[in-house]
Amino acid sequence: MVRLIHLIGAIILLFSYAYCGLSRLNEHDIEESYSHKRVKRQFERLGTKWSYGVVNYYYADKNNEIKEMVESAIAYIANHTCIRFNEDQNAVQRVQIRMQQNWLCQSTVGAPGMSMSKPIGELSMLVQSCDTIGSIVHEFSHSLGRFHEHTRPDRDNFMKVTTTVHEARPRPSGMTTMYGPFEHGSVMMYHADTYGPGTMDPLDMDYKQTMGNRRVTFYDMYKINQYYGCWCSKQLECKNGGYTSPSDCSRCNCPKGFFGNLCDERQQDSYELMAVNNLWQSITIPFAYKPEPGSDGFYSTFVYITGKANSTIEITLEGLQDVICTAGCTVNGVEIKFKEDSKITSPVVCCTDKPPYKNVFKSSHNPTIIELYSRTTLPSAVTFKYRFTNDKVVLG
């Protein structure tokens, strides 16, 4: 009977904190109302959430260039989640952003106030060596409660980790580790050789260059929304795997490559190709960074390849021009979205001497989307060939 009363109280409190179509829960009240052990295990460290989903912050010093990146990271998260940011040095729960004299890029996991009953205090976020907007989104994601993707409790299903470094150990599933699929391309993933060569390899080696990429993914924001209980009272009929955006309930959050309020539009300056038969067609497409409001610091050019209904679209790369080969392909690269879940990051290519450059990519998606991304104004280009087939053809 006591547990039933606690459960009813928790439900009442949950609905009492829903406003403007969004759910922003006060974890203190829920914990006080419904605290039996099973729920504590399920929502482990729930007290590290920011109260009502509001992140209070202030700058401890000045650096206009870094501050601009911080503000862009804040805007990106706010535009895709119900999390709100408030610049307030005197808030009882706040993060101090330090941009000088530290040469670090790091943050504590979770909000200040580790006790459920006292969500107060201050933590520091060090951002002087954060060199991309995605890196700062990574640190804010820590502050919001996310651990690294490579420490998920299910990571051994996707990676072989041999390092004994303490920070690489698997984490329990209580935070945002299990609110969406494992993703090698997550902004929360380190590059494969962070702890030394061969210490953190993906089981699918085509993903090795993808690990450590600093584009913010569809699932990166989805997991935050799931963890904070972000939702809209009215759900839109979003297309292509999108969902109603808890930042603005009149539009959808869309997977990469889909645009418009309902995710049913394509990029205006995109390339649209038709695979007309099973003969290979070749094309070279240029791409480069250009400023775009609300971006994660990268600009993407999208290619849409359409084939015959129920056919397989095959794509193979023939050349990369001025695409910079780095761990994590962090400057520019090519992503052919061929995975069954088109919302998840497929293997990224930026090196001609490493997998999966020589692969024949086979996709059942119609259209199949290719993303050419860059954060440099240096003109780059990719040459590839494509076709459709009803057979699983392997090039010799």
From Swiss-Prot:
Residues 1-20 form the signal peptide. The keyword Nuclease does not apply. It is an enzyme of class 3 (hydrolase). Its EC number is 3.4.24.-. Residues 38-231 form the Peptidase M12A domain. GO terms for biological process: molting cycle, collagen and cuticulin-based cuticle; proteolysis. Its cofactor is Zn(2+). Disulfide bonds join C82-C230, C105-C130, C232-C252, C254-C263. Residues 225-264 form the EGF-like domain. InterPro entries: MetalloPept_cat_dom_sf, Metallopeptidase_nem, Peptidase_M12A, Peptidase_Metallo. The active site is at E139. GO terms for cellular component: extracellular region. Zn(2+) binds at H138, H142, H148. It is found in: Secreted. Keywords: Disulfide bond, EGF-like domain, Glycoprotein, Hydrolase, Metal-binding, Metalloprotease, Protease, Secreted, Signal, Zinc, Zymogen. SMART domains: ZnMc. SUPFAM superfamilies: Metalloproteases ('zincins'), catalytic domain (SSF55486). Binds 1 zinc ion per subunit. The keyword Metal-binding applies. GO terms for molecular function: metalloendopeptidase activity; zinc ion binding. Glycans are attached at N79, N310. Metalloprotease. This is Zinc metalloproteinase nas-19. The gene is nas-19.
